[in-house]
């Protein structure tokens, strides 16, 4: 399979409960992550992480699937 460029958006509701699990999962898939930016939206009670990735569709599915199973975490991806 060919690798494709993509973006993954992650929102985290409970930072203290979910962030360690999110960071662990991202570290496990670090070989596909080209760039990462995280922003806290304290007034909204949400934290946002944006990832630039280069991966196969299977690799993207594995990462987003693991993240999506975490409580309080929502994930969306876009491949180009």
Q: Model-found features: residue ranges?
A:
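Long, contiguous binding/interaction regions
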Residues: 1-80
């Amino acid at each position: 399979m060919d690798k494709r460029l993509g973006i993954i958006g992650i929102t985290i509701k409970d930072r203290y409960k979910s962030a360690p699990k999110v960071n662990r999962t991202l570290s496990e898939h670090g070989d596909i992550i080209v760039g990462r930016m995280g922003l806290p939206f304290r007034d909204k009670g949400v934290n946002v992480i944006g990832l630039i990735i280069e991966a196969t569709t299977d690799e993207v599915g594995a990462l987003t699937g693991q993240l999506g199973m975490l409580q309080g975490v929502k994930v969306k991806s876009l491949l180009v």
